[in-house]
Amino acid sequence: LVGYYGYAMIAVSEPILKIQESETNDFDLMLFDKIIAYDHLREKMTVIVNMKTYDPERQYEQAVNDINEIINTITDPAPLAKLESDKNVEFTSTYTEEEFCDMVNKTKEYIFDGDIFQCVVSRRFETEYKGSLLNAYRVLRITNPSPYMVYMNIEGDEIISTSPETLVKLQNGVLNTFPIAGSRPRGADKQEDDALADELIKDEKELAEHNMLVDLGRNDIGKISKFNSVKVTSYQQILRYSKIMHICSEVEGELKDGLDAFDAVESLLPAGTLSGAPKIRACQIIDELEKTPRGVYGGALGYVDFNGNLDTCIAIRMAVKKGNKVYVQALSLIHI
């Protein structure tokens, strides 16, 4: 199953929350019977066809024919079609600068009043666009490579993302989440890069934010893990990407018997880096203050396989196209 879980999915596990209804589905998962998997590291392509179990001889023969047809298509590709694109695109914000600052100040008041420790508020930018986001995705693969490069086309609606952040992984019963908080740009050379990394790892504010998210990750993983299995396996490491560096930790746990990948997503969603702490109260404040529903943004993108394994990233650094409108979202983490 491949697809997304929207930000509003938290209302499933926490019915006390009344999240704004979005123009996109709360979740959308797709089952594919034909898959082309490409291993970029080993430069190896695998063609997979899932066959039905009734009439196995005939189904097997059909699956082999399908594989050969796919291989023939790959080895004799058609010229890449030129995709329609708008050259002059201007985004408009759903907030004026004054309105956004007012939202930030209200968030600060909640922190001073003791409701929350930190909160992540965001605003949406949108534009009219008739082209395909596949063009933008092609460019981003080169200019901003990330651990999770995503392009989805779901019945005409498009999603692209260059997310660096894992929400939750599940592999052979072992859960992992990777809290990320604190950032600096990459340096122009090694000396500047090392200096920025040293500055980041010594920044008390960045470390306080990061520690809060590590605690939140331990709590979220702990809800679905076996007793005494939760541990921090990596702590406050500098992780470098093409244009930015972050402080990253890793939290691990063993999934409780009787639970599965969907329980893992439910427990971790939304990530603390997209909501705040305590998470439930932060989500209530976000819903109160933000004008527009987040939709896919702040949720998760990824897959669940037939062995019950899971890999999802946080739906961030992304764009969504629905109809002729494209939406992007920018956030601000408020911590005092």
What are these regions (language model features)?
Residues 1-334:
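Extended alpha-helical targeting/anchoring segments
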